[in-house]
A protein has these predicted regions:
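Core AdoMet radical
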Residues: 48, 52, 68-87, 99-116, ...
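Mobile, glycine- and charge-enriched loop segments
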Residues: 91-149, 187-219, 263-274, 299-302, ...
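Non-catalytic positions within long, well-ordered alpha-helices that form the structural scaffold/packing
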Residues: 99, 127, 157, 227-230
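Canonical Radical SAM [4Fe-4S] cluster-binding loop centered on the CxxxCxxC motif
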Residues: 18-91
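Flexible mid-to-C-terminal extensions adjoining Fe-S/redox cofactors in radical SAM and related proteins
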Residues: 3-5, 16-18, 32-36, 40, ...
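Radical SAM enzyme [4Fe-4S]-AdoMet core and its adjacent flexible, acidic
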Residues: 174-189, 196-318
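A broadly conserved sequence feature marking short terminus-proximal activation segments
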Residues: 2-33, 290-295
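Short, solvent-exposed loop/turn segments at secondary-structure junctions
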Residues: 58, 170-171, 212, 243-244, ...
């Protein structure tokens, strides 16, 4: 299994997701048969459930992962359709019922969850359902806003969230605002306060840094960022290579795809330097069906490096036909089996357009 400490496999680093094999090197090593609204489905046992906030993000990052995920076949970004709160919560509750035997980890992502007025109800539902390993990914800008008598950060920690991932592109406040095109984001002092409060309440903060040429793009930049995180009290950082788009659905002229291709700092040279640096201690490799992760220890911190390629989603689905690797609850309440915006939904069947069983064929 690939999550055992101390056993590094060079071939996995070289091939990344192309080496992914459920039985040989995945975290769970097996699949599980489920019934989704009466239809059989074979599911990877460590599949995650992502809940997509329909709240439009107040940042305009030129490297935005969501804009790559929701780009249609013409290369145009499709803004998410948002169901009413009651319908969305009913759909989420129904999906959690169907996924009970799987007991997936749950991530809330965006859009921008910290600005979503539905977030308190979403988190309350997850808490009532005893959802496993709740993670919220945010740019942090709305964490001190009050909803229903408490701050958004209060709601996140009060729901027992395991992690809060906070996007931060630069150690410098002004540069971070410029890179993320978000003048109203958290400054370093505010970020430090979020880290302090979340940590004290049992929710582990993790800073997320996109690797970009001219910004954090080499070992020196990584070390500077880690020192910045440590000063703020964070003990968990992830460095992400800019995601590769799916060429079948995203035009190379798409502005986000073009930016990512031009600004992508390569992860491989950084990983080679990490391997040679005695201050880093290897922990594990994680193989995903379209992503590859390495986890290292550094000065009491967990340091994560990730590379992902959206073009591998369809490739891996053909390689493992009938297997669902992850679940996504879109902002319209429909449950999907990938991030593809136009994928046929799995359910619930009472939502219009959720009857097609294409993702289940071959299960």
């Amino acid at each position: 299994m690939n999550n055992q400490a101390g056993h590094f496999v060079q071939q996995w680093r070289n091939l990344r997701s192309h080496a992914f094999d459920i039985e040989q090197n995945s975290t769970a090593g097996k699949t599980l048969m489920l019934s989704l609204w009466g239809r059989p489905a074979r599911v990877y046992t460590n599949a995650n459930l992502s809940i997509v906030s329909g709240q439009e993000c107040n940042a305009d990052c030129p490297f935005c992962v969501e804009k790559l995920r929701r780009t249609n076949e013409d290369g145009v970004f499709e803004k998410p359709t948002q169901a009413g709160e009651a319908i969305f919560l009913r759909a989420l509750d129904s999906a959690l019922d169907e996924l009970t035997p799987l007991n997936p980890s749950v991530s809330v992502t965006g859009g921008e969850p910290s600005l979503d007025p539905r977030l308190p109800e979403i988190l309350s539902l997850l808490q009532r359902r005893n959802a496993r390993k709740i993670t919220v990914t945010t740019n942090g800008s709305g964490l001190f806003e009050r909803r229903q008598g408490a701050t958004m950060l209060d709601w996140i920690t009060g729901a027992g969230a395991r992690h809060i991932n906070i996007s931060r592109a630069s150690v410098d406040d002004a540069r971070n605002a410029a890179l993320m095109r978000m003048p109203d984001g958290l400054d370093s002092a505010g970020l430090g306060e979020v880290i302090r409060l979340a940590s004290a309440r049992g929710t582990r903060p993790r800073l997320s840094c996109a690797l970009m040429d001219g910004e954090v793009d080499n070992m020196e930049g990584v070390l500077e960022y880690l020192q910045f995180a440590k000063r703020l009290g964070a003990d968990n950082v992830i460095f992400r290579e800019l995601m590769k788009p799916d060429p079948a659905t995203v035009s190379r002229y798409n502005p986000v795809a073009a930016f990512c291709e031009g600004a992508r700092a390569r992860l491989a040279p950084i990983l080679r330097q990490v391997s040679r640096n005695d201050d880093f201690r290897f922990i594990r490799q994680v193989m995903g069906y379209y992503y590859y992760v390495e986890v290292w220890g550094y000065g009491g911190m967990d340091v994560v490096f990730e590379g992902a390629d959206l073009g591998l989603i369809d490739f891996m689905k053909r390689k493992t036909p009938g297997v669902i690797h992850e679940f996504v609850i879109r902002s319209d309440g429909r449950l999907g089996s990938s991030w593809h915006a136009r994928e046929e939904p799995l359910g619930p069947p009472w939502l219009a357009g959720a009857m097609e069983p294409a993702a289940l064929r071959g299960a």
